[in-house]
Amino acid sequence: MKNKPCYRLVSLFSGSKGNCTLLRVGETRILVDAGMSCRAIERALASVGESLSDIDAVFITHEHSDHTKALPVLLKKHPVPVHLSVDTAKELAACGFPTDYFFSHPPCYCMTVCGQREDAPEISVVSFPVPHDSRMCLGYRFCAQGETYSYTAAIATDMGCVTEEIRTALYGADAVILEANHDENMLMMGPYPYELKRRILSDNGHLSNANAASLLCELTEHGTRRMLLAHLSPENNTPELAYLTVRAALKTKGLCQDEDYFLSVAKRDAPVVLCDEFFDAERGCACGDT
């Protein structure tokens, strides 16, 4: 296939035990978060035909260990620029995180300013604030654009509510990875302590299936066609329930799976491919490479 560049968006892991996503545009490869062991990330990359040695940068959403635990080993094996907020870097340092690369070896760590555009080869990146119980939690919007093509993906997880800033960042994205953490009934009837339930349900907690479904219905009106439900709780959700909740909401809008949209659910311990496409230079869009 001669059409270039290729475009891949793959959830390698997603959930409370670890999160990591691969974005590839042409020969540029980016990881969003590195929350599993480095060895597990290497195996997951290999299973989808990629290699850690080809990664060009890592973008971190926030400091929680399920998003950062692989960084020390990963950077020893393959030193690359890591993009994260100053607050996230400070929080990791305060928690005793190995900080050899934080400030002493620039530009290994690139301090991300929320809302400011950053450019990697073939990709522009804009971060946006996401409400969560961390010092600074970010979502990311990635845009690949050339003379004859344009494609946008966005990632927003670990958020307790949907803000106007999140809507603005996600509107118009071709592909979206969005949190669908819990079913509210399962959470309330489950074994979690009351205070933990309150934290999860708060505006700085995690997004429910119902709230994810409502937002995805909005996004389809603004061009989103590929959607991946992420960061599912193993105690308070199931992949089937999350999928059916969102599909039912989309059906009320008259939309059909595989015709009007493509919906899938991320796995906790295995890759799920959301996009594996190439840009058609003549049509100016992304097309499936099958």
Q: Language-model segments: which ranges?
A:
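Metallo-beta-lactamase
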Residues: 86-149
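Conserved beta-strand hairpin/beta-sheet module of binuclear metal-dependent hydrolase folds
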Residues: 1-48, 138-157, 175
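Short, well-ordered alpha-helix to beta-strand connector turns
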Residues: 55, 99, 173-174
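Active-site metal-binding motif and surrounding structural segment of the metallo-beta-lactamase
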Residues: 38-84
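Active-site neighborhood of phospho(di)ester-bond hydrolases with catalytic His/Asp-centered motifs
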Residues: 32-35, 55-63, 83-86, 154-157, ...
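Short helix-capping segments at alpha-helix termini
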Residues: 49-51, 97-100, 147-148, 220-222, ...
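Cap/insert and terminal regions of metallo-dependent hydrolase folds
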Residues: 164-264
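Metal-dependent catalytic neighborhoods of phosphoester/phosphodiester hydrolases
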Residues: 69-78, 91-95, 237-244
